[in-house]
Structure formats: C-alpha cells, structure tokens
Amino acid sequence: MAINLFTSESVSEGHPDKIADQISDAVLDEILKQDPKARVACETYVKTGMALVGGEITTSAWVDIENLTRQVICDIGYTHSDMGFDAHSCAVLNAIGKQSPDINQGVDRADPLEQGAGDQGIMFGYATNETDVLMPAPITYAHRLMEQQAKVRKSGKLDWLRPDAKSQLTFAYENNKIVGIDAVVLSTQHAEHVSQKDLVEGVMEEIIKPVLPSEWLSQNTKYFINPTGRFVIGGPMGDCGLTGRKIIVDTYGGAARHGGGAFSGKDPSKVDRSAAYAARYVAKNIVAAGLADRCEIQLSYAIGVADPTSIMVETFGTGRVSNETLVKLIYQNFDLRPYGLIKMLDLIQPIYRETAAYGHFGREHFPWEQTDKAEALRAGAGL
C-alpha cells in the first residue's frame, strides 16, 4: 500500500495575525459581557509601533479599546522595545463605526426564532476519528507544539524564546491510518544572544519531544528547527498582522474544505462563525456516534433568512448509513437556524478570546465540542 503524506501548520499567539485575532475577540468578549444583543464586526491591524482597531459595532456597552488592546499585547508577551513591539508604548488607533441599519433590518425579528442570517455564505465542519478529540492529527499536534512553545517561554525555562513562532507537521498515512511523522518544522523568534546549537537543542528537548508521541517518530523523521539560522526580528516588526488571515490554522489545517469566512471579531449573529461552529458540532457528533469515521458538513445561508438554504454531508466512503439518512438525522436533531444554533451551543458568552490562538476546534471545553447528540443519532440510525 502506498504511503501518503499530509501537512498542516500552526502559528503562535505572538504571530502578527494572531495578535490581531486576539485583540478583535477580546473586544467582542468585553462587549458581550455588558450587552448580549450587541452586533460586533471588529477588525485589527498591527504593524511596528501601532495597532489599528476598526469595524462596525452596534452596542450599548462601553469598552476602553486602548487599554484592552495594550493588555492583550502585554499578555502575549510583547512588553519591551527589544522585541520590536511594546504594549506600553505602541500607538492604538480606534476606527470603529456602527453596523449598517440595512443589515439590522434583515437580521432582527420580533420572534427570535425567525432571526435571519447576518449574511449569505457557505460554512464547513469536519471530524475524523484519527485522534481522541476527533480532529486531524497534523493540525492538532501543530497547535500543541505552539502551546508548548508559549508555556516554556512564559515559564522562563528557555529565557531566549520570543512570542512569534510557527510549526508545521507532515504525517505519513497508509490506508488512511497514521504510520508516523515524516517531517517537523518549528521556527521560533529568539533573543540575539542564543546560539543556533543551543536553540536547536532547547526546542527539541523542551518543545518537540514533550508533545509528539514517540511511536510516531523514527530515525527517518526529518527536523527543521529555525532552518534560516536566525529569527530575531519577528512579530509586527517583521510582518504586519490582520484579523482573519489564518482561517486554515483556525480550522482543520487543510484537511477539510473552508467556506472562506473568518471567525475572530464577529458576534454569533454572523453565521461565518456560529454556523461553522455548528457544522463542527454536527460532524463531531456523527463521528462520535460511530455513524462514520470521517464526516464533512456543508451549510449555506441567505442574508435575512432563518433556515439554512442547504445541508450537505460527505463521509468519504466511511459511513455506516447513507448520506441521505444522515441529512434527515441532522434536520431531526439540530436546529441550524441562527437563533437556534446560538441557543443550542450557548454562544452568547465571552469565550472568544481564547479561541483566537491554537485553533477553534478540538479543544473540549468549548460548547461546540460536546458529543451530547451522539446517542440520539445512533438511535435514529437504528444502530
């Protein structure tokens, strides 16, 4: 049987695009704490010495945008000009306006159940039984490497680590089963003084080995640790960052399709975000129920219309029942209207800043990761 390779990447919380995502979602969380009915579309741009926060927000809440932005940057770890970005001295610009009343007219309804979608669009959700969190292994472990980098950096164990970092893992599959890790790429920003030898050794011992299962590593596994040999200039000084530019990192690492809509900075009335979470919830419950080994869901919506305009299921030949049966079970067990899915997943709560780094899926404490519908799906399928 032929060996197939598949690769996914992740980025750290200090990556410029992720700084922007976290600021946008921090603004959303602070608003939702005060005003659950707020309409928020918050975008952030970061570059050397500045953060620009803009977008369209309609709310009764008041948020100190400047202070909140500085706090997020500080929490990430950009606290000194030596890093090229300093939470205490960077400029913070506020360019927030109000959401168009034309959109409000299409979304708001006297009967909440008839709340229309905030925009048209397509959303995908995916699940696979190749990991215990029912996510693809490459993106799952790429995220875990980045979480470990932040943990080691913040503990001071490797005091030369800096916030910006990226990981990339290539997994080898045979007959759709993991047989090993073919390549590990990890690049991390670092202080000027550390040698390449010490950096490679530290990353291998403190970041890579504690995270990657040893049974997937072999003498044939290739390692690329800071392959350029130098990564001192990073963060917003190295590259500008924008909200919503890491949509594959945020989802399935390329293992499933993507509708194109980003998540961060958007309140749950935006189906780009909430329906993508619901699609993951549906797919995960189908796999958890044993109805398929892999499952991809597509949802679509029209602006101002409550019911989804389509539901598609693909199980890649792994389904225990037909795709048509699965679609019927979805209609019977999940309310995928905007208000219905918001209520079903309890989305009006300040949980979004945490989603903005290390992936939105495969982290069990988020409500869309529950598998509470699996039993009903099994029963409905007659299994």
Swiss-Prot record:
- Required cofactors, per record? Mg(2+); K(+)
Q: Name the protein family.
A: Belongs to the AdoMet synthase family.
| Organism, as annotated | Actinobacillus pleuropneumoniae serotype 5b (strain L20)
One GO molecular-function annotation for this sequence?
methionine adenosyltransferase activity
Q: A biological process (GO) annotation for this entry?
A: one-carbon metabolic process
UniProtKB keywords: ATP-binding, Cytoplasm, Magnesium, Metal-binding, Nucleotide-binding, One-carbon metabolism, Potassium, Transferase
- HAMAP family xref list: S_AdoMet_synth1 (MF_00086)
Q: What is this protein's name?
A: S-adenosylmethionine synthase
Instruction: State the residue spans of region: Flexible loop.
Output: 99-109
Q: What is the uppermost EC class here?
A: transferase
Q: Tell me the residue numbers annotated for binding Mg(2+).
A: D17
The reaction(s) this protein catalyses: L-methionine + ATP + H2O = S-adenosyl-L-methionine + phosphate + diphosphate
For this chain's record, the cofactor binding note is:
Binds 2 divalent ions per subunit. Binds 1 potassium ion per subunit.
UniProt pathway annotation: Amino-acid biosynthesis; S-adenosyl-L-methionine biosynthesis; S-adenosyl-L-methionine from L-methionine: step 1/1
Q: How does it assemble?
A: Homotetramer; dimer of dimers.
